[in-house]
């Protein structure tokens, strides 16, 4: 994040919108996964979004305009489960961060939203090697990526701290 921000500043680029959407899956049990993999996971899902926000938020606040959309997950709102051990906790952290920042930034023109989708049709499950397991999920549990993106955009523009797309996930 530091090098990215330095490059943007060097080019005179002003950032008014940030979407933190990087991630990957660690589908094995915590005890069976090396610390290096777990550390990298936390770096991508927790540390990098926090650093990007920390570095960009002062400029957004000074300009009186900014939109920050943290792509979390409905998993961050549910109890923990075996495998993907850090995933729910990392996403819960993004949700709490978004809620806190949304509150802190009231009246500044900067909106912060946690987008919390459920299962969404993307290449994520192919890349993470979990596609076969996901095939067992009922089709009604799946969301289309464009609909999730639209709901997230609408939520951050309306300054909603949390957005849970899909009626099937709003009851969780």
Role assignments for model-derived ranges:
Residues 21-26:
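Conserved NAD(P)H cofactor-binding loop of Rossmann-fold oxidoreductase domains
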Residues 29-31, 37-42:
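Substrate-binding pocket helix/loop in short-chain dehydrogenase/reductase
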Residues 33, 80-86, 100:
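Active-site loop-to-helix junction immediately N-terminal to the catalytic Tyr of the SDR YXXXK motif
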Residues 53, 89-90:
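Active-site helix of classical SDR
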Residues 53-54, 99:
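A short, exposed helix-loop element centered on a Lys and neighboring polar residues
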Residues 73:
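Residue(s) in the substrate-gating loop at a strand-loop-helix junction
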Residues 102-168:
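SDR active-site lid
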């Amino acid at each position: 994040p530091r090098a990215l921000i330095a490059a943007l500043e060097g080019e005179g680029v002003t950032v008014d919108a940030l979407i933190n959407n990087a991630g990957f899956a660690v589908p094995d049990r915590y005890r069976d996964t090396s610390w290096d993999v777990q550390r990298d996971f936390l770096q991508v899902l927790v540390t990098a979004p926090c650093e990007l926000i920390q570095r960009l938020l002062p400029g957004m606040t000074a300009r009186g305009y900014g939109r920050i959309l943290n792509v979390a997950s409905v998993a961050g709102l549910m109890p923990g489960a075996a495998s993907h051990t850090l995933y729910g906790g990392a996403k819960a952290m993004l949700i709490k961060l978004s809620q806190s920042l949304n509150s802190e930034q009231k009246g500044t023109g900067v909106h912060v939203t946690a987008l919390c989708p459920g299962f969404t049709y993307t290449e994520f499950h192919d890349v993470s090697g979990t596609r076969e397991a996901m095939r067992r999920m009922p089709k009604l549990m799946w969301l289309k990526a464009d609909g999730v993106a639209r709901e997230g955009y609408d939520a951050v523009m309306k300054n909603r701290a949390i957005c849970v797309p899909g009626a099937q996930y709003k009851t969780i």
